[in-house]
Structures are given as structure tokens and as C-alpha cells.
């Protein structure tokens, strides 16, 4: 997920300067094409006379201004799967349309290149399956979860990214967006009540701690913010951005989901315990919340570490062929490890903070009994 957001952020950076700096340049959108035929030819490689394979691809444009146009496009296969686009007949591809003249009116005014295989249809299918299962299993809560997911994505794309691109502090921007996302998500799913308010306060304070610890980790570990090649591309497009700040922001956003989950679990537990026995004191409710929180700490911290470990599995496999001292001191390795640890530390803060806030707010609201089982009857505490 973190890499996806980085790539999308890079696209924002590449698009915005073009629109601002050159209003006369013709910029054409990418289009969809269909591979109708492929012929294979041997070709001279670019490196030391190595032999490579060339696919002479017949592509038909399926969308846009030049729909129906057919082109022969050379597709080089070097044997490196990281860069090769190995096509087969019937594949749908993304086409990059490059204008040759200041005005574009006919297919002869453009060059057409194969940018990549089209994968968005598969993404749409799995998204639809996910939403359908969410509605089928979650019922009403599933519907509110979908709304919260969409709202969070909108906050990231239309609030966080523009704020960073326009020079706002990435850390403050990430904390602000994280708090807004928390408010929307928890109130939508849990209703307006003291339980939800407790979870929001616990998450918000923990996010601030995550921001502070991320700054400390980056400063003392001398992290550069350049942990992958996408960061180098971003630097080429926008060298004015704070890459250490962007790294800290990514740590904060990555920890957000686990923090919300932890806070909601603790607040819900404290609320259920109090509903069972209303004679319990704030201290007793706090202790109950801490007991549950201690169980949550292990699983949620493990979840964060496994997420980072899974996304960096090739990097982990690299450790078998490199000195361990050198491996753990690599910038990319240190970045991934510290990111997981920052999220885990934030969870540790989230447990006692949410427990004490929930114990106090839920006990305080006992004068007005709130039925938490019926969200439509909830009132703002």
C-alpha cells in the first residue's frame, strides 16, 4: 500500500508542474489498445552486443481520439523481467500517445508506444468482490465501512497530497488527515457516542506520538527518505520537497489503521464491561481496558511487522548473500524496520491512552444512558 501511495504521489507531482509551466504543450491522455498480432525477430542488444528478442506488435487503439487506428510497435525483450513487457495475442495494453506536432488532428501527428499491460479491469473486479463481501457479511456496518474507505482515500488524494505538494509540512499534514479520517471512520461505524469519542481521542493522541517518534528515528538514524527508485523519480520531478518529511508522513499513515483498530477494540470493551456492571469505578474500567489492551498489543504489533516484512520480502531474501552488519545498516532496510517499530510504539501508547479516556468518558456519560446496539438512537456524548 505504501508503494502504491508513493507512485500515485509521484504521478501528482509529474502532472501538476506540466499544467503550471506550459499551457501550450499538447498533452494527450493514455489510451487502451488490443494486441492483434505478434511477430518475433532477433535484435542486437544495447549492452555489449547481447542478443535480444524483438516483438513486432500489431496494436489496435480501442479508446480515445484515435480509436480504430492500427500501428506496428517494436517491443524489446531483454530477458530482464523487471523491465520487459512480454505480450501475447489478445492482451490489452496501456498506450502512451506522444504528439509530434503542436497541433494533433490525425494519427500521423502522434507516436504510439506500449506503456504497460492493462490491469485496471482486474483491480475493478477484486474491488467489486471486496465491496460485495463487505455488504453481505457486514450488512449496514459494511455499507458504512465502504463510505469510510472512500472518504479516507479522498482525504489522502485530495487533501494530503495537495498539501504536501504546495509546501505544507508533511508530518503535520499526515497527522491532520489521519485525525480527520479517524473522526469520519469511527463515527460512521460506531455512531456518535462516548465509546466512539474515546477511540477517536486515543487514536489522535497516538498519531501525534507516531509523528514525534518518526522525526526522532529519521534524525538519529540519518534516514534520507530515498528508500526506493520511485523516490529518486520523485526527486527528479520535485527536488524542492522534503523527503524525510514524506517518509515520516508515510510512517504515520501506515500506522493509522492499526491504531484505529486498537482504540476501537479497547473503547468497545470498556463500554461493554460498564454496561454489564455500572458500579465499576473509573480505575476498575481502566484496568479492564488495559487487560484487553495487553492482549491486543501482541497481535497488532505483529500485524504491522508482518505487513512491512511481507512487502519487503525480496529485500529480506537479499540478506542471505550479504554481511548482516552491512544489511541492517542499509538505508532501505533501516527504513522498513524503523517504520514497523514506529507503528508498534504508537500502538503501545494507544492502549493506556484509550483505556483511561474511555473509562472516564463512558463513566461520565452514565447519567444519560446510551443504547450502543442501535446506532440510529445514539447521541453525541
Per-range role (PLM):
Residues 127-234, 241-254:
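Transmembrane alpha-helical segments that form the functional core of multipass membrane systems
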Residues 79-120:
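Extended, hydrophilic extramembrane loops/domains of integral membrane proteins
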Residues 16-20:
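Sec/Tat signal peptide C-region and signal peptidase I cleavage site
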Residues 26-55:
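Structural detector for short beta-strands of small beta-barrel domains
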Residues 152, 205-210, 248, 252, ...:
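Hydrophobic alpha-helical transmembrane segments of multipass membrane transporters and ion channels
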Amino acid at each position: 500500500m505504501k508503494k502504491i501511495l508513493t507512485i500515485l504521489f509521484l504521478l501528482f507531482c509529474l502532472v501538476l508542474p506540466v499544467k503550471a509551466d506550459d499551457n501550450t504543450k499538447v498533452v494527450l491522455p493514455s489510451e487502451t489498445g488490443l494486441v492483434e498480432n505478434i511477430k518475433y525477430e532477433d535484435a542486437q542488444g544495447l549492452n555489449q552486443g547481447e542478443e535480444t528478442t524483438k516483438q513486432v506488435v500489431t496494436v489496435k487503439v480501442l479508446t480515445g481520439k484515435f480509436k480504430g487506428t492500427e500501428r506496428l510497435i517494436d517491443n524489446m525483450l531483454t530477458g530482464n523481467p523487471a523491465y520487459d513487457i512480454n505480450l501475447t495475442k489478445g492482451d490489452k495494453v496501456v498506450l502512451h500517445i506522444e504528439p509530434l506536432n503542436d497541433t494533433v488532428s490525425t494519427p500521423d501527428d502522434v507516436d504510439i508506444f506500449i506503456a504497460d499491460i492493462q490491469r485496471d479491469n482486474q483491480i475493478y473486479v477484486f474491488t467489486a468482490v471486496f465491496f460485495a463481501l463487505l455488504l453481505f457479511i457486514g450488512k449496514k456496518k459494511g455499507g458504512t465501512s465502504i463510505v469510510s474507505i472512500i472518504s479516507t482515500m479522498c482525504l489522502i488524494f485530495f487533501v494530503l497530497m495537495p498539501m504536501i505538494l504546495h509546501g505544507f509540512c508533511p508530518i503535520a499534514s499526515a497527522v491532520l488527515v489521519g485525525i480527520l479520517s479517524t473522526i469520519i471512520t469511527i463515527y460512521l461505524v460506531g455512531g456518535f457516542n462516548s465509546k466512539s469519542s474515546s477511540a477517536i481521542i486515543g487514536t489522535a493522541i497516538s498519531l501525534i506520538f507516531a509523528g514525534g517518534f518518526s522525526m526522532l528515528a529519521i534524525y538519529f538514524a540519518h534516514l534520507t527518505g530515498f528508500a526506493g527508485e520511485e523516490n529518486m523519480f520523485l526527486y527528479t520531478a520535485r527536488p524542492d520537497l522534503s523527503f524525510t518529511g514524506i517518509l515520516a508522513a508515510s510512517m504515520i499513515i501506515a500506522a493509522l489503521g492499526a491504531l484505529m483498530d486498537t482504540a476501537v477494540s479497547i473503547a468497545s470493551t470498556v463500554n461493554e464491561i460498564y454496561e454489564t456492571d455500572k458500579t465499576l469505578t473509573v480505575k476498575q474500567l481502566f484496568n479492564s481496558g488495559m487487560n484487553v489492551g495487553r492482549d491486543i498489543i501482541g497481535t497488532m504489533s505483529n500485524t504491522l511487522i508482518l505487513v512491512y516484512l511481507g512487502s519487503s520480502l525480496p529485500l529480506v531474501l537479499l540478506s542471505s548473500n550479504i554481511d548482516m552488519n552491512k544489511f541492517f545498516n542499509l538505508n532501505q532496510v533501516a527504513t522498513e524496520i524503523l517504520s514497523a517499530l514506529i507503528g508498534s510504539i504508537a500502538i503501545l501508547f494507544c492502549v493506556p491512552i484509550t483505556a483511561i479516556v474511555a473509562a472516564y468518558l463512558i463513566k461520565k456519560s452514565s447519567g444519560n444512558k446510551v443504547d450502543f446496539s442501535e446506532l440510529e438512537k445514539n447521541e453525541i456524548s
